[in-house]
A protein has these predicted regions:
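Rossmann-like NAD(P)H-binding beta-loop-alpha module
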Residues: 60-107
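A short alpha-helix-loop-beta-strand transition element characteristic
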Residues: 2, 68-73, 102, 245-253
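FAD-site-proximal beta/loop scaffold in flavoenzymes
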Residues: 46-71, 159-230, 237
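Conserved Rossmann-like nucleotide-cofactor binding loop
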Residues: 35, 85, 111
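FAD-binding core/adjacent interface of flavoenzyme oxidoreductases
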Residues: 1-78, 155, 166
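Cofactor-binding loop segments of dinucleotide-utilizing enzymes, especially the Rossmann-like FAD-
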Residues: 82, 108, 209, 264
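C-terminal, flexible cofactor-proximal segment of oxidoreductases
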Residues: 231, 236-317
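A Rossmann-like FAD-binding core segment of flavoenzymes
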Residues: 3-7, 95-194, 198-200, 248
Length: 317
């Protein structure tokens, strides 16, 4: 079933839900992910579009539809954040908007994809340049208005007209997590043991963006989908082990490489001794994505959608 969590009573071991009866638990997994912080810059809450949830994607899709159906010569888009989401989104939107698109990618640091392998970073820079995406590096967003964005570069303020601002920067934990009486770090993430259990609450497990986890070697676990996917396997095992009096396994993160989509028929990947970009990397990334689908039903639905989508797009033109 689906419901919104309003609170957790750890003493009575109850999960409180909005408009639903509360649920009791013997073991609890906290995997609420994170939220996009839009309160960092004046105007962002009102005028910037986050890009994290399915609801966010639908809102963005509707805004793009309106812009594409308008009489405007150009569609001006500013994407805040030169991380993975920002770069992939910039490439995809550049393909979608074509000659009408005027895209700029805004990054406060001196390079995009700061934690990415050099090969992937260079492939991304090449793709962005080929698609005409303007890079604003070492640039801070000062404020956002309905039709403009103010940027600071080397102490100089510049206001630029825009039709759409997309915010991909930062992560904050859900409000319900902050209300829990658990040990948390400065970002509000729940600190866990290497077995992914909440400190002083062995019946509760936490993983993903809301967890501050160190693995069996004491290394900080990155806040990536790849890490969360691996944590899920360990969590499932450890729940079973805790219920059957078997030893729990400390989490051991395995970095399997990195893949990024860079628009239509283009991607980059590194890992397991392989470095690949272009259409071959795009195909490899899609196959890996399909393989990672949780069930055969998901694989069939996604694969079928990939096959028929180009046909539908062609017929609708």
């Amino acid at each position: 079933s689906q419901a919104v969590v309003s609170g957790i009573d750890t003493k009575k071991q109850l999960v409180q839900l909005q408009d639903h009866p509360e649920i009791s638990y013997d073991r609890l997994v906290l995997a609420l992910g994170g939220e996009t912080p839009l309160d960092m810059v004046p105007g962002a809450t009102s005028y910037a579009y986050p890009f994290r949830t399915v609801t966010d994607a639908h809102r963005l899709q509707e805004r793009l539809r309106i812009l594409e159906q308008s009489d405007a010569d150009k569609i001006r888009v500013a994407i805040v954040g030169g991380g993975y989401s920002g770069v992939e989104l910039a490439c995809k939107l550049a393909d979608r908007l074509g000659e009408r698109g005027r895209l700029r990618l805004i990054e406060i640091g001196d390079q995009i994809l700061r934690t990415s392998p050099e090969f992937n970073r260079e492939a991304a820079k090449k793709a962005l340049a080929a698609k005409g995406v303007f890079l604003d590096l070492e640039t801070k967003v000062e404020s956002i208005k309905q039709d403009s964005i103010s940027l600071e570069y080397k102490n100089q303020l510049d206001t630029i007209p825009v039709d759409l601002v997309i915010w991909t920067v930062g992560t904050k934990v859900a409000p319900v997590v902050k209300t829990l009486n658990f040990k948390q770090n400065q970002r509000g993430q729940i600190i866990t043991t290497p077995t992914l259990q909440v400190l002083d609450h062995s019946e509760i497990f936490a993983l993903g963006d809301l967890a501050d986890c160190r693995d069996a070697e004491g290394q900080q676990v990155p806040a990536t989908a790849q890490a969360a996917f691996q944590q899920a396997d360990y969590t499932a095992w450890n729940i079973w082990a805790s219920l059957t009096n078997r030893p729990l396994l400390p989490f051991r993160y395995q970095h399997l490489g990195e893949m990024m989509a860079l628009g239509q028929d283009n991607a980059t990947l590194t890992g397991l001794g392989i470095k690949l970009d272009g259409s071959l990397a795009y195909l490899a990334r899609r196959l890996a994505y399909l393989y990672r689908m949780p069930t055969y039903e998901h694989q069939l639905k996604v694969g079928f959608n990939w096959l028929v989508r180009p046909i539908i797009d062609t017929l609708s033109r």
